[in-house]
């Protein structure tokens, strides 16, 4: 295993199905001058709450891009629901959020002030995807958020429903069938 599972294999885990892609979304105030990962240097950036997937992803992205949290003016830990207000009140320059799209938090930020979605691209990102197979290249659709008309490249993962291998097959089948028979309600 890797990360918190390092040295402790989890042979009893089984994936039932993938649900939706979750993308790393890096949102900056338009006036912050952030157009790329390198532009985060010297900025106040919310990296995600401690222990979150967003925080782990951003720390890995920064490391791969040759940046440390010390290179930022501030590495913030603002609650998700407070991110749009903090960004628009200029208490931070950018925030990261791993999420599916469309997302109401991101819509609040885009409607509260002039924002841009920062592309997560470049040689460092290529190396990250090559060395961490659970990340993939993806994009945030254009037209979903105010001010973002074209797709924005980034990386992401897939949300997967995982169960114990001890779960009886008929129960696993029942869960899968219930979700897919009622997929519109499941969303």
Segments the model singles out, each with a brief description of its role:
Residues 168-178:
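Short amphipathic alpha-helical coupling segments at ligand-binding clamshell hinges
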Residues 62-64, 112, 177-181:
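Short, solvent-exposed amphipathic alpha-helical segments in soluble enzyme
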Residues 1-42, 46-49, 59-60, 117:
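Short, glycine-/small- and polar/acidic-enriched structural segments
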Residues 3, 32, 69-168:
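Pocket-lining segment of extracytoplasmic ligand-binding domains
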Residues 181-187:
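Periplasmic-binding protein-like
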